[in-house]
């Protein structure tokens, strides 16, 4: 019987799930919006909310707890420096899951997982800067 079983297995081992959510969290922190399947997005949203709550605490223990989950130092740095300040007046509900249709290959339901009050002008800014640097390096 499946009584009191809280999370989806997503057809993965525990270590694979843990690594996948760590990578998804790092991507969500970097881009502030990711496209994934609906079940993954629904599982990821509460995990990301907990990470933002840790960032709002801002102390060393919270930073180490976040680093143990995300395992990406630049993502944790952005989490604490940017999101901790951005969401200091908001009590929970830091993520939004928006259904986005179905994937053509296998008809899997797709969703957009995004941070509320995200900086829309920053979308793709890091990619544009990296691309410009690559072009400059190729020319010079």
Curated annotation (Swiss-Prot):
Pfam families according to UniProt: Ribosomal_L17 (PF01196)
Ribosomal protein keyword on record: yes
Keywords: Ribonucleoprotein, Ribosomal protein
GO MF terms held by the record: structural constituent of ribosome
GO CC annotations on file: cytosolic large ribosomal subunit
UniProt keyword annotation of Ribonucleoprotein present: yes
GO biological process: translation
PANTHER family associated with the record: LARGE RIBOSOMAL SUBUNIT PROTEIN BL17M (PTHR14413:SF16), RIBOSOMAL PROTEIN L17 (PTHR14413)
Quaternary structure note: Part of the 50S ribosomal subunit. Contacts protein L32.
Family per similarity comment: Belongs to the bacterial ribosomal protein bL17 family.
Protein name per UniProt: Large ribosomal subunit protein bL17
Gene encoding the protein: rplQ
């Amino acid at each position: 019987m499946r009584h009191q079983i809280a999370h989806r297995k997503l057809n993965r081992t525990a270590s694979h799930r843990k690594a996948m959510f760590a990578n998804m969290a790092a991507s969500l922190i970097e881009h502030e919006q990711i496209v994934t399947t609906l079940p993954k997005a629904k599982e990821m949203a509460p995990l990301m909310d907990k990470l933002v709550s840790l960032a709002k605490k801002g102390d060393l223990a919270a930073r180490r707890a976040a680093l143990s989950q995300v395992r990406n130092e630049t993502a944790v740095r952005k989490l604490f420096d940017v999101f901790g300040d951005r969401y200091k007046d908001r009590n929970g509900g830091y993520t939004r899951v928006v259904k986005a249709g179905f994937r053509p290959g296998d008809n899997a339901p797709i969703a957009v997982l995004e941070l509320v009050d995200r900086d829309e002008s920053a979308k793709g800014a890091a990619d544009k800067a990296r691309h410009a640097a690559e072009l400059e390096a190729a020319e010079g």
